[in-house]
């Protein structure tokens, strides 16, 4: 899987909105929307995948501790 495909998979599995993804990867909502829709060849990078993954893994760890 490419980094872009991995991000799309996470978005689908966690049912994330563009604004939540944007916050996790430190990008604007419009940039995130363009990348999600693959407009003009815009795709998520490896760094953005890592940021998104780490952001939500940390949240899940906090839930697990409860």
List PLM regions with ranges:
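Short, charged recognition helix plus adjacent turn
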Residues: 9, 34, 61-66
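The alpha-helix within a helix-turn-helix
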Residues: 11, 22, 53
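Short, flexible helical or helix-coil boundary motifs
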Residues: 14, 18, 59-64
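Short alpha-helical "recognition helix" segments of helix-turn-helix
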Residues: 19-25
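DNA-recognition alpha helix
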Residues: 25-26, 56
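Recognition helix of helix-turn-helix/homeodomain-like DNA-binding domains
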Residues: 27-43
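DNA major-groove recognition helix of helix-turn-helix/homeodomain DNA-binding modules
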Residues: 45-63
């Amino acid at each position: 899987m490419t980094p872009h495909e991995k991000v799309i998979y996470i978005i689908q599995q966690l049912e994330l909105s563009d604004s939540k993804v944007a916050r996790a990867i430190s990008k604007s909502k419009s940039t995130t929307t363009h990348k999600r829709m693959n407009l003009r060849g815009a795709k998520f990078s490896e760094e953005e995948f890592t940021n998104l993954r780490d952001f939500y893994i940390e949240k899940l760890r906090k839930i697990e501790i409860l």
